[in-house]
């Protein structure tokens, strides 16, 4: 049965309930606006349901299993029995708790929740289609719209996610049974995080990367400890190869990859995970109806208020320019809601942190030394290795370092690069320092608890000033 169209009105229509959209909706509700949030899949979006949260749960669980079986140096001998199905159930429980919380918070802040796929139907209208079997549609008239439809995995020609042995990250994280072997196409952050998970769970992992190294957005000094650790876990790397096809065999599949000269290499495996990046979802929105056109990357250009070229339409998260980061999306959602409500708000990207949950972890914020020099600063750099940290040594994880970058003349902190234990947590202190306009002296003179990993940030600042105590000065 087809249900006729229903028409409703709202101050703010938010399309997509990921970490950008639901935060925007909640903030707008807090500010007294009438808000409608439309989601076609699950509240919390890719991040909470299929990406950030489930991957970190599996990273933690696989890490516990691996640590338990590899602690002989500490006098601990164990052979843990891993039930992957129970591990996945635990991961799903974490996801359910968080997504349920999002839905409750939205309702508590007066947000009207609508399930369906939204597209623009004019300069002030959205059409929402419910379900895919003629369950009807409705029209939402809005004063302002916020586009937060996120991103989806990029498919590689020849590797259709609908084919059984070919996985995207969402499918890989849902496997209740592990394959004996896996080829991972892509050595970026998704490929490296998941290669670590599966290697620690005993899967024979091969990473095929088109470029000449892993984690191409980071320098070799940051990527090197991650690659070394991955190789210790048994991960096999092949660089300069582009995967182009796969074929069935009696024992699994064969993945074929070619170098720039066309010379082919074959890899026998049971599964292949394609993790070459993500692309913004803007092609389903009927943007012509509202007068918007995505840029060459498929994103919507925005200003410092997250506003697009159309005055009453905002874009946040993966569909807006900049790195695809959940916390960036959330902040953009807050700013968009506040601007719509008439509050003074603007975006500032100088101190947006990023993290990669590999082993060891990576945490970065602000400018690198090269970035700082390119922007006209005279950068001074300080570093502190974790193998000189008492706390790092007591955890058994002492790979990596903290590096801080500052302007030599003023002393203002400009950026930080961390690779090592808990880098994702440690980088927050340095992000706050940059946001507040702190100097090297401010960081160095702040007393840090001993023994902690956070002392490394203080020591790195002291090193940049030339008076480090626990490492040699420049």
Curated annotation (Swiss-Prot):
SUPFAM superfamilies: FAD/NAD(P)-binding domain, FAD/NAD-linked reductases, dimerisation (C-terminal) domain. Gene3D superfamilies: 3.30.390.30, FAD/NAD(P)-binding domain. Transmembrane segments: none annotated. The keyword Oxidoreductase applies. Keywords: Cytoplasm, Disulfide bond, FAD, Flavoprotein, NAD, Oxidoreductase, Redox-active center. The gene is lpdA. It is found in: Cytoplasm. The active site is at 450 (proton acceptor). Signal peptide: none annotated. It comes from Halobacterium salinarum (strain ATCC 700922 / JCM 11081 / NRC-1) (Halobacterium halobium). GO terms for biological process: 2-oxoglutarate metabolic process; pyruvate metabolic process. Homodimer. Its EC number is 1.8.1.4. This is Dihydrolipoyl dehydrogenase.
């Amino acid at each position: 049965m087809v249900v006729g169209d229903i028409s409703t009105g709202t101050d703010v229509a938010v399309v997509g309930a990921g970490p950008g959209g639901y935060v925007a909706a909640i903030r707008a509700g807090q500010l007294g606006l009438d808000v409608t949030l439309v989601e076609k899949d699950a509240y919390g979006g890719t991040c909470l349901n299929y990406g950030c949260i489930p991957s970190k749960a599996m990273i933690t669980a696989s890490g516990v299993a691996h640590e338990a079986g590899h602690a002989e140096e500490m006098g601990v001998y164990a052979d843990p029995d891993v039930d992957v199905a129970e591990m996945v159930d635990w991961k799903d429980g974490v996801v359910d708790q968080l997504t349920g919380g999002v839905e409750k918070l939205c309702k508590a802040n007066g947000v009207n929740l609508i399930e369906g796929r939204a597209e623009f139907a004019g300069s002030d209208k959205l059409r929402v289609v419910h379900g895919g079997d003629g369950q009807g549609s409705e029209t939402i008239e809005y004063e302002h719209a916020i586009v937060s439809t996120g991103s989806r995995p990029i498919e590689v020609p020849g590797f259709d996610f609908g084919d059984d042995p070919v996985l995207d990250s969402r499918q890989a994280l849902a496997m209740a049974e592990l394959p004996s072997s896996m080829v991972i196409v892509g050595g970026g952050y998704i490929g490296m995080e998941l290669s670590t998970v599966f290697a620690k769970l005993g899967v024979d992992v091969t990473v095929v990367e088109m470029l000449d190294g892993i984690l191409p957005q980071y320098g070799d000094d940051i990527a090197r400890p991650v690659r070394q650790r991955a190789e210790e876990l048994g991960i096999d790397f092949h660089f300069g190869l582009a995967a182009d096809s796969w074929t069935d065999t009696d024992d699994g599949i064969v993945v074929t990859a070619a170098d720039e000269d066309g010379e082919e290499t074959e890899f026998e495996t049971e599964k292949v995970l394609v993790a070459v990046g993500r692309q913004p979802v803007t092609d389903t929105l009927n943007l012509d109806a509202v007068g918007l056109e995505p840029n060459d990357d498929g994103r919507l250009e925005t200003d410092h208020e997250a506003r697009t070229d159309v005055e009453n339409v905002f874009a946040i998260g993966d569909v807006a320019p900049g790195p695809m980061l959940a916390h960036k999306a959330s902040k953009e959602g807050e700013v968009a809601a506040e601007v719509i409500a008439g509050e003074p708000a603007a975006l500032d990207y100088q101190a947006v942190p990023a993290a990669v949950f590999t082993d060891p972890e990576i945490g970065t914020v602000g400018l690198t030394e090269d970035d700082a020099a390119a922007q006209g600063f005279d950068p001074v750099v300080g570093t502190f290795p974790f193998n000189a940290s008492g706390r790092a040594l007591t955890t058994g994880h002492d790979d990596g370092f903290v590096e801080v970058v500052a302007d030599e003349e003023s002393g203002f902190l400009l950026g930080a690069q961390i690779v090592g234990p808990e880098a994702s947590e440690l980088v927050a202190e340095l992000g706050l320092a940059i946001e507040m306009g702190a100097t090297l002296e401010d960081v160095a003179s702040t007393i840090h608890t001993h023994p902690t990993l956070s002392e490394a940030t203080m020591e790195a600042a002291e090193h940049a000033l030339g008076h480090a105590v626990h490492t040699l000065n420049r």
